[in-house]
Every structure is written in C-alpha cells, then in structure tokens.
A protein has these predicted regions:
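Glycine-rich segments within core transmembrane alpha-helices of 12-TM secondary carriers
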Residues: 134-155, 161, 176-180
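Hydrophobic core of transmembrane alpha-helices in multi-pass small-molecule transporters
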Residues: 20, 101-116
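Cytoplasmic membrane-interface "Motif A"-like loop-to-helix N-cap segments
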Residues: 72-84
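Intracellular juxtamembrane helix-capping segments at the cytosolic ends
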Residues: 115-130
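C-terminal ends and interior cores of transmembrane alpha-helices
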Residues: 82-103
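Short amphipathic helix-loop junctions that connect adjacent transmembrane helices
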Residues: 29-47
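Central cavity-lining transmembrane alpha-helices of secondary-active solute carriers
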Residues: 52-70, 117
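Intracellular loop-helix junctions on the cytosolic face of multi-pass helical membrane proteins
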Residues: 1-7, 157-218
Length: 218
C-alpha cells in the first residue's frame, strides 16, 4: 500500500487524507443529526424527521451545483477551502445547542458539505492524464480514506449518543475539517486546476457570472 502511494503523483496522498478528515463531519451529521435534534434540542420526532429528510435531500442537490461551479466559476481547490470554512461556521452554530440556531447551522453545513464533494474528486482526476493507469488505484485509495472517515465518525457518534452532549462531537468535526484545510493549503501547488478557464473570461462574462452568483446568494 505504501509503495503504491509513493508511486502516485504529488497531491494524491494529501487528497486521500483530506477525504478521511473531511468525511468525519458528514458521518457525524448523517448518523446523529436526528438524535441531536430530538434528545438535546427537544424538538418533536415528526419535525426532526422532516428536517433530516430535507437536509439529506438538499445535500445531494448541492453536489450537482458544486459540479457546475467547480473549474468553471471557481477553482476546485478554492471551492473546497471555501466550503470547509462554511461547514465549520455551520458546525459552530450547531454546537451552541440552541434551537433558534438550528436552521442557520444546518443550512451552512448543508451548503458546505454538498458543494465540496465533487471538488475533491475533480482535483484527484486532474492529478493524472487520461491514459494513466494509476488513476483507478488513486480513486480506490481515495474511497478507502473516505470509508475510514465514515467508520471513525460512526464509532465516535456511538459514544456520545448515550450522554446527549453532542457539542464535543461537533467541535471534533470542526477540528477534523480544520486539519483537512491545513493539508490542502500545504499541498496547494499540486492541486491546481488544469486549463482553468476563468483567467480568460471577458468583462461581459465576468458581469454575467457576478449576477448569477449574486442571485444564488440571495
């Protein structure tokens, strides 16, 4: 395994670690969100189920949006950094365990976690040329890192489900996201987009893009 990683281009090992650390926070939300809402915030089960359903549904929708934005309007590495920061803001609001902050916290985390899924895979793809056979092994390692993040996240959730004190779990998610952020910053030079079209856009294109982004933000 170590030999395979050493034969990979620069940035691949970093992306595998990023997958492991950044997946932890989503695993926490996926497995413990309903319990956090009902047991710690005291929200009714029916409302909690609706909130969790909307959260999961819109997370997949934002993955599609992230695929459109990445490499077109913003580089994938910058998109990933931005979305990690948005996730951490959402996790901080959730960690306050205040029902009035639930919607804004979940919304921020949902946007961040949804938009950055495609960016990490796109960065991994661009580490290779299309004819490079090592790309399949790289994606295998990347998904292995993702599974490690899910596994650790699920195990950690099991310890906190009995105490009903999810703040420490949410702060741990902020920590793992921050580690992923530091890794991508350290390997910034190796994870750039190839043939990034943004520098070649005309003023008219920029005006159109800014209007679209403003509408999306509103």
């Amino acid at each position: 395994m170590i030999k395979i990683i050493r034969e990979m281009p620069h940035g691949v090992a970093a992306l595998c670690l990023i997958q492991a650390f950044s997946t932890f926070s989503y695993a926490v939300q996926y497995s413990s969100l309903a319990l956090f809402i009902t047991k710690q915030l005291g929200i009714a089960n029916l409302s909690a189920n609706s909130i969790v359903g909307l959260f999961l549904s819109f997370s997949y929708i934002f993955q599609l949006i992230g695929g459109v934005i990445g490499s077109r309007f913003i580089s994938n590495r910058l998109l990933f950094v931005t979305t990690i920061l948005i996730q951490n803001m959402g996790l901080f609001f959730l960690a306050q365990a205040n029902p009035s902050l639930l919607n804004i916290g979940l919304s921020l985390f949902m946007v961040g976690s949804g938009l950055n899924v495609t960016s990490s895979n796109s960065m991994l793809t661009q580490c290779f040329i299309p004819q490079d056979d090592r790309r399949e092994s790289a994606f295998f390692l990347s998904y292995a890192g993702m599974n490690v993040g899910y596994c650790i996240g699920y195990i950690a959730c099991g310890f906190f489900d009995y105490s009903n004190q999810y703040q420490y779990l949410l702060y741990a998610s902020i920590l793992t996201n921050s580690i992923a952020l530091l890794i991508i910053i350290k390997n910034w030079a190796y994870l750039g987009d190839k043939n990034f079209p943004l520098p070649n856009l005309t003023k008219r294109n920029w005006y159109f893009i800014k209007n679209i982004l403003a509408i999306a933000f509103i």
